[in-house]
Amino acid sequence: MLMWICPNCGREFKRVNQSHYCGKAPASIDEYILKQEKNIQSTLFSLKNTIHDAIPEAEETIAWSMPTWKKKGNIIHFAVSKNHIGVYVGQEAVLFFNERLKGVETYNGVIRLKLNQEIPLSLISDIAKWNYTMDQMD
């Protein structure tokens, strides 16, 4: 199988131009956001603040090089890809919020928001709260 090698860090990937961090992962969510393109940083800070306000008791960390909120387990993550922001909420949340997610692309527990799309912050807040509640029940 052909592998792509990043010319900057020398890491090998299965896909050409695989999105990744050269070097070490960011130490904080703010650092993650500040490493992204300037034109989406304000959107990412709005997303971060929405999740923080929804579940202030959750720990904010970086896991798998993604902004992550967790308590007992992982609650919600997000990551920037080439063409979208992926909000990793889990398949159970996607199914539970199916009606409110109509018209929003989802795949395997991930909400995919196009970079030029308005972020449904109220919906993300509600999903974060629901996931937090489900996490505490486990």
Predicted feature locations:
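Charge-dense, helix-prone N-terminal extensions
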Residues: 1-138
